[in-house]
Amino acid sequence: MLSSPRKFASTVNTPALPEQTTVDRCVSELRANGVVILPGLISQEQLRGMQNAFDVRLRRLRWNNFEGYQRTEIYRHMVEDVLLLDQGFVDVALHPLVKQVISRYLGNNFELNEAKGWKSLPTTRDFHGWHGDAWYDQGQAQEIPKEVKLAMYLTDVRSGALNYIKGSHQRQHPRPVKNFEIVDYPKDQIIDLTGPAGTALLFDTSGIHRQGVPMLEPRRAIFYNYHDPEVPLQQEDIDYYRYHPLLLNAAFLGNLTEEDQRILGFGNKTNYIPAFERSMSPPVWYNLFGGIHGAQLRLRELRIRIADRLRLLTKGK
């Protein structure tokens, strides 16, 4: 006789619904300024769990069967697919306040399309200068599609914070912006969004923003990307498969609502690319390290076989 299916406790932390006045204020500020700081989304316990899981990924470069960070530039260590790491990362993405504010700003067809973070290293270089985030095919766009990012600091950020020019959103198609173009903006329109660990904010990515300069101490932060998946993507992001379907951890997906499942893209293959392979070739060192690793495995196998042969010879005596 078959036993009843095992039931598991709910995993998704469902906070109380936010007061409507809070939602209204956040939506109004986001529409007016392009950016809004959200009231506390998570507990200190949740934050510690997220920090610990994130720090483990930052201990080493990703290699073979070792999980870790990716590094494609000098000043950042990238952690992809953070929804795999800890329950808190999922809870933040699906927080009732986040969902309500974004749905009123973007409409009801939005999804979470990307969830990653990085450790920014100290530098005085303005390596990630003023820009709006390019993501859609501007040749097909009749207007400026809206996209919102949720940012959360995992460390106290006293320098190198997100800088944002209030009211610069939905004015032009996103592009790199030169420093000389910024001088015409009043200083009180340029905000430096410093804050303690756990600070969360939403911003329209078409607005002009950058990572602040200088970065005096390491900064850990996560960034979630929400937009309508039906908007045609720019070719660069298709080639890189940037907006692939989310990678999720089944342990963190208990008690999801239908809306949560839609936001996480359950069953949506719009931007799925079968048998995707990146067109660029890996660097020379990639093949070199792979060859060295293969040689080490063969040497280990040889040592085991020699040891086994010696044991047999010893027993024979």
What are these regions (language model features)?
Residues 2-32, 39-137:
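Non-heme Fe(II)-dependent double-stranded beta-helix
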